[in-house]
UniProtKB/Swiss-Prot annotation:
It holds the Pfam family KOW. InterPro entries: KOW, Rib_uL2_dom2, Ribosomal_uL24, Ribosomal_uL24_CS, Ribosomal_uL24_KOW, Translation_prot_SH3-like_sf. Belongs to the universal ribosomal protein uL24 family. One of its GO terms (biological process) is translation. One of two assembly initiator proteins, it binds directly to the 5'-end of the 23S rRNA, where it nucleates assembly of the 50S subunit. Gene3D superfamilies: 2.30.30.30. It comes from Prochlorococcus marinus (strain MIT 9303). GO terms for molecular function: rRNA binding; structural constituent of ribosome. This is Large ribosomal subunit protein uL24. Coiled coil: none annotated.
Length: 118
């Protein structure tokens, strides 16, 4: 009988086309249709944290004597495949294309609007 090993998590970074500070729209899930700014990217897990999306409530115990416990709400991560870059000018979500400029630099461009992001 073959010996099975537990599934290992990959530690390889995944190239993401969504960066911190981008405006994105959620395309699936309970927060579908919401837009927000990317607060943080997690490239190893291929996830992003978006402002105002996937809100979780956490109960925090008091750390010092005399302090009371509290309830904290915070954004949890969303898989990067569940969000699309959003154009604030045209109010539309779009896929991303990488464009190589004449000087050799790479820019991101929205496919639907042709708008350059970087």
């Amino acid at each position: 009988m073959p010996i099975t090993t537990p599934k290992q998590k990959t530690t390889q970074r995944i190239k993401m086309r969504i960066h911190k500070g981008d405006t994105v729209q959620v395309i699936t899930g309970k927060d579908k249709g919401k837009t927000g700014e990317v607060l943080r990217t997690l490239p190893i897990e291929n996830r992003v944290i978006v402002q105002g999306v996937n809100i979780r409530t956490r109960h925090v115990k008091p750390t010092q004597e005399g302090e009371s416990g509290r309830i904290v709400t915070e954004e949890a991560s969303v898989h990067a495949s569940n969000v699309m870059l959003y154009s604030n000018n045209k109010k539309i979500a779009s896929r991303v294309a990488l464009v190589v400029e004449k000087d050799g630099s790479k820019k991101r461009r929205l496919k639907k609007t042709g708008e350059l992001i970087d």
